[in-house]
UniProtKB/Swiss-Prot annotation:
Regulates neuronal morphology via inhibition of the WAVE regulatory complex (WCR), a complex that controls F-actin cytoskeletal dynamics. Specifically expressed in neurons. It holds the Pfam family Ig_TMEM132_5th. Residues 1-18 form the signal peptide. The keyword Nucleotidyltransferase does not apply. The keyword Ligase does not apply. This is Transmembrane protein 132 homolog. It comes from Caenorhabditis elegans. One of its GO terms (biological process) is dopaminergic neuron differentiation. It is found in: Membrane. Residues 789-842 are annotated as: Disordered.
Amino acid sequence: MLKKLWICISCIVTTALSDHITFSPPDEAFVLFHSHQNTNFTSVFVQDGCPNSRNLMATVYSADLSSSRRVFEEIPLHCAVRVRIITEKVVVTRPYVDLLAVVDESLSRHVGAICVHAQLTSSTSAIELGKCYLNRHEDQKSSCVIRIPVPFSWFPVDQNRTSVLSVSYTVSEKCDQNFHDLPQHLIEVNSRIAKQKIDWLANATETSVTLLSTASQAFSQNSMQTLFLHVKSWANETQPMEIRLWVDSRMSIETVYPTSSNWTIRVSSASRPFFYTSLVCTPKERMTGFNDNIVAILIKMVSSTDAIKDDVILHWHVILGPKSSEPPPDDHKVATKFSVIADEVAAVVIVPKRKELMNLAVISGIQVTSSLRIFTISIGAKAEDVTTQSHCISSDANIIKVSPTCSSVYLDGSESNGSSDAQVYAHYLRYTTTYSFRVWFPKLPLKIWMSSSTLSTIKNWKVGFWRDLPLGGGVKRSRAARQFACVNRFQHSHVKVLASLWIEDIKTGDQLYLSSHKSILFDVTNIVHNTLQISNRTVANVKFYEGRAKVIGENVGLAKLIVRNAKKSMDLVSENISVQNKEVSTTGLSARPICDTSFRILPILFSPAFFKVEIAHSKSLTKLYQQCSIFASVSYSDATWEPLNDLDSSYFEMSAHSDNERALAVSHHASKVHVIAIDENWPLPVVEISLQSSAQCASTINGASPAALAVTVLNVPIKINNSFPSATDLDSSFSTTIAPSDSLPSIPFHIFVLTIIGLIILFLFISFVRRSAAFKGYEQLVVPFFSRLSSSSGSNSRQEETNEWVWLSQPQPPSSTISSGYSGNKSTAERQSSNGDDPSRTSISYHGSEISVFIAPSQGNVVVNQSSRHPRYTLVDSNSDHNLARIVPKEDRWTTGGHEQFHTWTWKQRGGGGGRMMEAPIRESIA
């Protein structure tokens, strides 16, 4: 078997133009170009590593062969979900981090259920996890909020200090898979409590206990709030205490955390009928004086519709000092009240499809658009899409634009620069939010790469064209006179438009490049159809073919190749082109076979937006009657060359001849050559290929057929795979195949044999039934026969004289039967029917029930006795109504309704009664 050699597209300079990659849509993926090597780089760029749709296709062209495939066979799961981190700063009164996950409508239909995992990591590497489940087919699962509580131990002790947490998330199909970190986001954590509210729980002579909360603190469905117990003691020795708490049935205590290392907190729950939570607080021994928080309590309200009816009341009972049998004083029992409100908006979030935008509209003149959605996150961790109720504006329209309805952000080509912080504002009711986009802008001027900026005429290479003739005498004609002429053709030049997308920080002067380096450029040739122009079209023209651009010389002169921005009326780049009358000659013709082309796109590790492209060419014929294309290129005396498959087919002709036509056949048209393997016994046949001018201009060179412009000889290897595996390979393959599988049970041998025998019996039975169908007339003959026997033997009183005539016809009568004699025209049938004494007819009678059966054998098998012939009516095929009309003599007639008709069916003659009665019997025809 032929082993394919995988070749990177940048490894062979001579095939840089023969192997060409294009993408569709062309603005979603780009081939990277290395400016130092003038060859395609080995990687392809896809923004964010996510396509806009699954239909992103890549096509590789090699000679006249092409191979296409999807860039992404499966949509990456992280591309089907948009995740926004809602919480930017965590405060101790609301110790949790919220993340919003939204399904991407355009990509989620290609994936199933999605699980989003989120992870918080502290500075000490402690982690907290959260997850949510998404499914676009369920209305309630198109978006979700992940709320992860932050442990109180992660908050700094000093309220004037802040600590940092990292948030990361990943996407998978199942929620039980291992977590894999994506790029992490940093979040600040602060212990400061702004606008505190103080409620006194106990106020003794030497100790006071207070409850700290935020001002105007209120609860809503599924919300969480933090309450702090503050102790102030000025005694010589601080006494222990017990704090009892009765919570509302709508509330639950999530966490109790000691905030001071000088106190030991023991939490317990009392049994019925008390239902309170006891906090036994014990200070360190001989601790004198204290003024700080000792306990943080995280309380959560249930998500019930009845939760917002009344205020929340918490009952406190503080017992100071050691326990005694005396009841505690009543002045240490306090009830605190908190208001309950409906779930309200806590944050407004902008969820874009892409965080970064490539301003290619400046180059292509086609608007670049990215969708946008606006969500609200409530205090109770509920998400709602409010895009249609929002209004958006851009901070700078020269960088980025946004639709007023917040449906999308876009770039139309009128922008002047990019930015790493292009802000978009969204307004919903009284809430306002912003989002910062990163907009990459083309670095001007662009770059144009050309295989040759000077186009010369090619010696002896004639091409034809129609030339307009001048009209004399000032006579106006409806159609101008034209003349066919041949001239030397001009060279072609391949063109690539290259761009570098960057962001420059005006304040710091830092430069960021999207391709990771300023020398790695994007090949944007496929998107400049509308902006790539020639300043003088009489000198040269630009044509696009299969995603490539080429400049074609027309007349001697100078021109400029320009990429122009119509929005701003400015030239992004220009390159001079010179078309001169200086002749160059063809110096050689190179060719190579391409039997098959395939490629693969592989991701580059740690670079999610970059992919490596590898192309495989098969240059050998591996099967009989396989066809290979011949890629040919012609070189010139000025060290330039052109692939012939890029030229117009009317410019040239190619002829090819095989040295062994029994092994290798050549099939060529005017401009294409293909070879076909015929025999494998000659492994390396030779093909001679010659290049000539077009046939229309062949006679213009010295009045004779022109000589070949270039000739080359090509070896085409034939490697037919007729090898058989060795005995060792067979044994190993058999042992692998015969080994019983865990998933498929083995079948016993006797059951297999019985199954085969049953199938054979079934086949024989079906064959017998089909053959017995040919004797269907026998059933119609025998059934009335036995019925007559039973009826005649059972009734002796009734005497009947019955004659029943039954005609039997063969299913497929041979040509020698008498029925074939009546398959001709009418005159032949009448002539044969008149001969009523044909010796080839034989009568066999069964007199038991007076049934006469007439059988017409072939003439070759009947011995006729001429002396014992008796006149009888001719027996004909009952399938023909035309022939049956001649069975009964003309004198035998029967009358029906006063009209005379010929008797064309079998007839019965019944005796008895006193007369004869002719009846029309039932016609029986056996096919």
